[in-house]
Amino acid sequence: MDVRRRSINSIHQIPSVGGTAPPMLKPKQPTKVDAVDLPDSPKASDALPLPLYITNGVFFTLFFTVVYYLLVRWREKIRNSTPLHVVTLSEIAAIFTFVASFIYLLGFFGIGLVQPFTSRSSHDDVWGVDDDEDVDEIVLKEDTRTVPCAAAPVDCPLPPIKPKVVDPVPISPPSSEEDEEIIKSVVEGTTPSYALESKLGDSHRAAAIRREALQRMTKKSLAGLPLDGFDYDSILGQCCEMPVGYVQIPVGIAGPLLLDGREYSVPMATTEGCLVASTNRGCKAIFACGGATSVLLRDAMTRAPVVRFGSAKRAADLKFFLENPLNFETLAAVFNSSSRFGKLQNIKCAIAGKNLYMRYSCSTGDAMGMNMISKGVQNVLDFLQDDFPDMDVIGISGNYCSDKKPAAVNWIEGRGKSVVCEAVIKEEVVKKVLKTNVASLVELNMLKNLTGSAMAGALGGFNAHASNIVSAVYLATGQDPAQNVESSHCITMMEAINDGKDLHVSVTMPSIEVGTVGGGTQLASQSACLNLLGVKGASKEAPGSNARLLATIVAGSVLAGELSLMSAIAAGQLVNSHMKYNRSNKDVTKASS
């Protein structure tokens, strides 16, 4: 408190007790920064005990002397076959002197860089206190007595003084002016928006500048899109280019899902009301009946380049070469050289005229594996070019893979992880938890999921809403949302067992494409959700086991979601539940632009 009072007394000259109080002396309010007398700014070299040129000479001499001495000793040890780690006291002193002089010289060359910051910090405040209006007002109001603290009587009235608060000089930080210039250059097109990160070296600042430039160019506000609170360095060169913010999606928890004897709390990122609640009800029914079991049928990512020949015969020659078991070991060695985890499993070929499509399948460890398999395929193509010089590589992907598209080849052959998950739901659980009966569920499944989907010409869509659960889990755990297309391929089967009392329900999903490393899995939120499931990162004990476990959890969650939705439809509760949990109460006319 005394420090603050002294700072006020230095501004307002207060007379001693008994003297005539002259008018209060107030500092003249500066109108410009250069109108205020400022003390000389300190220099970085002021901290040195000797003049700068003497200090530099001493350390330069020490540096080169000890370097010469250590080099001579090093040559002598080599000549005498003395181990280098055996050092004398003089050598230890020389090493210490070398390190000290090197650190000094390294710091000396940084003085020019440090100087502007030390100069600027000493000019930040005219009065020697923080440049804050609120702080100035508090300090001025805190001490309003007309005599020094020590001379003030106990019962002395303290007449209020109305000091004139000096407004701080508005000094914009240099970065703001610089940012304004960059924003203008982006708007004018002289600075590419995509180059801001490399130009500035600050991902958050680049996103803020890009965001402001976008608002000025489009004349649309992005006030509702958050900017702060996100690590933009974590997505640089990996997840997203030219960011201007991030989208918030709520994450709910369904479960516990009892699967293969273990309980899982399943994170689901969604904006669809009732989805998490419905999946949670399915988990409850499965849990009450002893849980679900899963089987992993296949684990292989695929990539299918397309090549062209001068004739169909030459395309067939390569097809026969690739499918010949005698050549597989050679091709596998070439393919596997690109990664520790990518192991070639098989090659399936298809011909269309003189064009050949080669579908390579390989294991990819705990990664989803698209980059891994693409590198391996490129190695094989380079190898084949020697024996088939007339082969024209049209593309590393020829859509026979098939990635992010509904395709029969994925439905039949599988892609990623192929999983079957099943459970037996007791009659009393069907009635109490699911509010329906076994016969109604079996009939609905046949007419809706099987016959209805066949009438619609569905491809892998023989289910109620597998895509809902897959999308929600994918968003929460950092998977590629676009791969929901083939990952949601699912056929849901329901059958009455035990004389029609109990329900056997299963989901078969041939192409679940997931990974626990790479891509969006390394983001903080998604990494936390993976950690919740116990599958974060790569498994050191059994490479690939985390990704396989995640695939079975996805299938188990789909099983719970299918069971609950089908029960709601069979019981006639779908409309009521969605009106309760999934209906917007906002006036949409006010939200329209």
From Swiss-Prot:
<feature type="region of interest" description="Catalytic">
    <location>
        <begin position="178"/>
        <end position="593"/>
    </location>
</feature>
<dbReference type="InterPro" id="IPR023076">
    <property type="entry name" value="HMG_CoA_Rdtase_CS"/>
</dbReference>
<keyword id="KW-0256">Endoplasmic reticulum</keyword>
<dbReference type="Pfam" id="PF00368">
    <property type="entry name" value="HMG-CoA_red"/>
</dbReference>
<dbReference type="InterPro" id="IPR009023">
    <property type="entry name" value="HMG_CoA_Rdtase_NAD(P)-bd_sf"/>
</dbReference>
<dbReference type="InterPro" id="IPR009029">
    <property type="entry name" value="HMG_CoA_Rdtase_sub-bd_dom_sf"/>
</dbReference>
<dbReference type="GO" id="GO:0005789">
    <property type="term" value="C:endoplasmic reticulum membrane"/>
</dbReference>
<dbReference type="InterPro" id="IPR023074">
    <property type="entry name" value="HMG_CoA_Rdtase_cat_sf"/>
</dbReference>
<dbReference type="InterPro" id="IPR002202">
    <property type="entry name" value="HMG_CoA_Rdtase"/>
</dbReference>
<feature type="glycosylation site" description="N-linked (GlcNAc...) asparagine">
    <location>
        <position position="449"/>
    </location>
</feature>
<comment type="pathway">
    <text>Metabolic intermediate biosynthesis; (R)-mevalonate biosynthesis; (R)-mevalonate from acetyl-CoA: step 3/3.</text>
</comment>
<keyword id="KW-1133">Transmembrane helix</keyword>
<keyword id="KW-0812">Transmembrane</keyword>
<comment type="function">
    <text>Catalyzes the synthesis of mevalonate. The specific precursor of all isoprenoid compounds present in plants.</text>
</comment>
<feature type="active site" description="Charge relay system">
    <location>
        <position position="272"/>
    </location>
</feature>
<feature type="glycosylation site" description="N-linked (GlcNAc...) asparagine">
    <location>
        <position position="336"/>
    </location>
</feature>
<feature type="transmembrane region" description="Helical">
    <location>
        <begin position="94"/>
        <end position="114"/>
    </location>
</feature>
<dbReference type="InterPro" id="IPR004554">
    <property type="entry name" value="HMG_CoA_Rdtase_eu_arc"/>
</dbReference>
<keyword id="KW-0521">NADP</keyword>
<feature type="region of interest" description="Disordered">
    <location>
        <begin position="1"/>
        <end position="36"/>
    </location>
</feature>
<dbReference type="GO" id="GO:0004420">
    <property type="term" value="F:hydroxymethylglutaryl-CoA reductase (NADPH) activity"/>
</dbReference>
<keyword id="KW-0560">Oxidoreductase</keyword>
<keyword id="KW-0472">Membrane</keyword>
<feature type="active site" description="Proton donor">
    <location>
        <position position="578"/>
    </location>
</feature>
<dbReference type="GO" id="GO:0016126">
    <property type="term" value="P:sterol biosynthetic process"/>
</dbReference>
<keyword id="KW-0414">Isoprene biosynthesis</keyword>
<keyword id="KW-0325">Glycoprotein</keyword>
<protein>
    <recommendedName>
        <fullName>3-hydroxy-3-methylglutaryl-coenzyme A reductase</fullName>
        <ecNumber>1.1.1.34</ecNumber>
    </recommendedName>
</protein>
<feature type="active site" description="Charge relay system">
    <location>
        <position position="404"/>
    </location>
</feature>
<dbReference type="GO" id="GO:0005778">
    <property type="term" value="C:peroxisomal membrane"/>
</dbReference>
<feature type="glycosylation site" description="N-linked (GlcNAc...) asparagine">
    <location>
        <position position="582"/>
    </location>
</feature>
<feature type="transmembrane region" description="Helical">
    <location>
        <begin position="52"/>
        <end position="72"/>
    </location>
</feature>
<dbReference type="InterPro" id="IPR023282">
    <property type="entry name" value="HMG_CoA_Rdtase_N"/>
</dbReference>
<dbReference type="GO" id="GO:0015936">
    <property type="term" value="P:coenzyme A metabolic process"/>
</dbReference>
<comment type="similarity">
    <text>Belongs to the HMG-CoA reductase family.</text>
</comment>
<feature type="region of interest" description="Linker">
    <location>
        <begin position="115"/>
        <end position="177"/>
    </location>
</feature>
<dbReference type="GO" id="GO:0008299">
    <property type="term" value="P:isoprenoid biosynthetic process"/>
</dbReference>
<feature type="active site" description="Charge relay system">
    <location>
        <position position="480"/>
    </location>
</feature>
